[in-house]
């Protein structure tokens, strides 16, 4: 089909080749013209940049000349101040000479006083050593008494245990004696005691349960308090951030003030330089620097002299302060020793008083023991026939004898202060009461009921506090979450803050560059060192900013390409669904970036056949040609339809729809 000359499916006719060559030449000419115009614009921009740089440097030279004049005026002012400082220095030297003489007299007095205080200190030190020895002896005695006290406490506990066992045996004997006469009463009392014991056990259980609840509530309360503390720390951090912002504003204001001072300083330097038209700028600057160096040397010499005098005065003052400190330390030591002496005398008086009281208590206890013995003798005479009472009395007599021996040993071993406490603990013996058990149970029950009520009230209060604190915690947590969300929204992709950061960086770099340029101009550096590093840093920063912009634009372009490809896929799928052809844009052989000149059309109804891989149409918009690729049947079918619809009627859409219908009739139905 491609061999026939009149066929519309020729790959590349001769007229089309001529048109392609003309198109390529025109495209080359347009590209060259565009490059020439871009070079011209770049040349004009470079010329404008050159002119602006020349104007800037001329303005900078004018400003620097003005600054040199102000510096000259400042140096005149500095010379005047130097003369005034010289006169002040002479006056201060005279005053310092007089003060040195007076200080020497004071030093002699202080040395004499120091010798006297040294002697007193040695005397007090010897006394202090004596007191330390006495104190060590007292400590050793105290340790001995403490050890003896511990031994006596152990003996007392053993005696108390024996006393309890004896009381139990005594109670058993009394119960055996009264069992015959009071059986009914004892039965009722036993029942009552059992009931009380059961109630006591129940109350103890409830008490334990309530105690566990209280512990859990206290733990919850501690956790709530910890969360509250965390909240307080977060609020403190927020306040500190606000303070830091205020500090930052203050520092910016101080920076502006310093820059103003810097400008005024340069103006004074310019004023100080004489305006001679005959001299050049370099000679003026050299003269200015020489004067400045001379003034620096003079200032250094005067500063050294002044520092020497100041150090001498400071040394004298430090010696005086050291002497005063030593004197105050000696006085404080004397006062502390007097206080220790007074406290020890008071302690000795107390010990003597306690000794007298202990002697009186011992006599009282002996009298009470004698009375008890007499009562026991009377009872033994009245109840000679009762064996149990005799045993009871013998046991009591043994107990009294043991107590008597214990009291004698305590008198010998215990110190005066510790005897009183031990005698009091030994004298408090448990009384033998018949109805004591019932009273003890009743009192325990009443106490436990009161404690139960108190614990219930505390539990209710703690539960209420827990609820209120939980609500407050929830409110605080919700507020914190809202604040965090707001803070994140404020920080996330904030272009204003980013722009401010970039501006601040450029401002800092420009100010640094300006300072270094001024330094190079003032110090009169060589041409090799005229270009500072800050200029390179500023250019690098500009490059980085441009690179970030380029990266952002590239990201945006890639995002738009993805969106475009996705949308084009959607459109092509819609076209293939409703019009019956899948469309694919092919790059042109002349320009690979041109994707709209050649279109590949594949019928939707050819997808189920093996021929679908090679049966398709290519429509070239620029060359206005149509090419069929596939089998002979497909090409003949296309030829018939082309003669009918394109050559005769010039209707390409009808040709495409007729081709689709014929493919459907042939392959699908």
UniProtKB/Swiss-Prot annotation:
Cysteines paired by S-S bonds: none
Gene Ontology CC: kinetochore; mitotic spindle; nuclear envelope
Record's keyword terms, sorted: Cell cycle, Cell division, Coiled coil, Mitosis, Nucleus
Coiled-coil zones: 24-225, 302-487, 533-573
Example GO BP: mitotic spindle assembly checkpoint signaling
Stored InterPro entries: Mad1
KW Cell division (keyword) present: yes
Subcellular location: Nucleus
Primary subcellular site in the record, as a coarse category: nucleus
Function per UniProt: Central component of the spindle assembly checkpoint.
PANTHER family: MITOTIC SPINDLE ASSEMBLY CHECKPOINT PROTEIN MAD1, MITOTIC SPINDLE ASSEMBLY CHECKPOINT PROTEIN MAD1 MITOTIC ARREST DEFICIENT-LIKE PROTEIN 1
Family (UniProt): Belongs to the MAD1 family.
Protein name: Spindle assembly checkpoint component MAD1
């Amino acid at each position: 089909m491609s061999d026939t000359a009149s066929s519309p499916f020729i790959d590349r006719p001769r007229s089309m080749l001529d048109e392609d060559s003309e198109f390529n030449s025109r495209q080359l000419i347009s590209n060259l013209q565009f490059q020439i115009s871009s070079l011209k614009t770049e040349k004009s921009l470079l010329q404008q940049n050159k002119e602006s740089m020349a104007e800037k440097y001329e303005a900078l030279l004018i400003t620097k000349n003005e600054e040199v004049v102000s510096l000259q005026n400042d140096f005149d002012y500095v010379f005047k101040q130097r003369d005034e400082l010289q006169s002040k220095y002479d006056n201060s030297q005279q005053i310092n000479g007089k003060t040195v003489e007076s200080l020497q007299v004071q030093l002699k007095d202080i040395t004499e006083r120091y010798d006297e205080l040294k002697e007193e200190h040695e005397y007090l030190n010897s006394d202090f050593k004596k007191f330390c020895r006495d104190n060590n002896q007292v400590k050793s005695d105290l340790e001995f008494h403490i050890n003896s006290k511990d031994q006596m406490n152990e003996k007392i506990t053993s005696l108390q245990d024996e006393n309890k066992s004896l009381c139990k045996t005594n109670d058993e004997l009394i119960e055996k004696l009264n069992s015959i006469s009071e059986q009914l009463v004892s039965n009722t009392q036993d029942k009552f005691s059992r009931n009380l014991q059961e109630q006591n056990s129940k109350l103890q259980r409830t008490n334990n349960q309530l105690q566990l609840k209280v512990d859990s509530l206290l733990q919850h309360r501690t956790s709530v308090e910890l969360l509250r503390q965390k909240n307080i720390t977060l609020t403190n951090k927020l306040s500190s951030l606000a303070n830091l912002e205020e500090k930052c504003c203050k520092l910016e204001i101080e920076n502006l003030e310093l820059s103003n001072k810097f400008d005024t300083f340069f103006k004074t330097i310019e004023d100080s330089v004489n305006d001679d038209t005959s001299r050049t700028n370099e000679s003026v600057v050299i003269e200015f620097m020489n004067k400045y160096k001379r003034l620096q040397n003079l200032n250094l010499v005067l500063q050294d002299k002044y520092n020497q005098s100041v150090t001498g005065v400071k040394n004298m003052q430090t010696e005086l302060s050291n002497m005063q400190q030593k004197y105050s330390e000696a006085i404080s030591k004397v006062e502390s020793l007097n206080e220790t002496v007074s406290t020890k005398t008071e302690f000795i008086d107390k010990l003597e008083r306690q000794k007298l009281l202990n002697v009186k208590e011992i006599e009282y206890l002996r009298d009470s023991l004698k009375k008890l013995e007499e009562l026991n003798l009377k009872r033994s005479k009245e109840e000679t026939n009762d064996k149990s009472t005799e045993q009871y009395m013998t046991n009591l007599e043994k107990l009294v004898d043991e107590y008597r021996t214990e009291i004698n040993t305590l008198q010998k071993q215990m110190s005066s202060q510790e005897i009183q406490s031990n005698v009091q603990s030994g004298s408090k013996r448990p009384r033998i009461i018949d109805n004591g058990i019932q009273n003890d149970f009743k009192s325990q029950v009443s106490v436990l009921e009161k404690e139960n009520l108190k614990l219930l009230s505390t539990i209710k209060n703690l539960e209420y506090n827990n609820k209120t604190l939980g609500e407050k915690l929830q409110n605080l947590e919700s507020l914190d979450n809202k604040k965090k969300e707001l803070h994140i929204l404020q920080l996330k992709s904030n272009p204003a803050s980013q722009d401010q950061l970039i501006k601040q960086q450029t401002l800092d770099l420009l100010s640094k560059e300006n300072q270094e340029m001024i330094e190079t101009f003032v110090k009169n550096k060589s041409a090799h060192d005229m270009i500072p590093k800050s200029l390179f840093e500023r250019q690098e920063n500009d490059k980085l900013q441009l690179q970030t912009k380029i990266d952002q634009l590239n990201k945006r372009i890639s995002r738009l390409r993805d969106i475009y490809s996705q949308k084009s896929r959607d459109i092509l799928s819609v076209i293939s669904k409703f019009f019956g052809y899948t469309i694919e844009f092919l790059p042109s052989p002349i320009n690979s970036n041109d994707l709209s000149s050649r279109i590949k059309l594949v019928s939707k109804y050819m997808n189920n056949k093996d021929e679908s891989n090679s049966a398709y149409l290519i429509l070239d918009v620029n060359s206005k040609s149509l090419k069929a690729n596939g089998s002979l049947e497909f090409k003949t079918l296309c030829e018939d339809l082309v003669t009918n619809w394109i050559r005769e009627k010039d209707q390409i859409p009808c040709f495409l729809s007729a081709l689709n219908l014929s493919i459907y009739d042939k392959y699908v139905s």
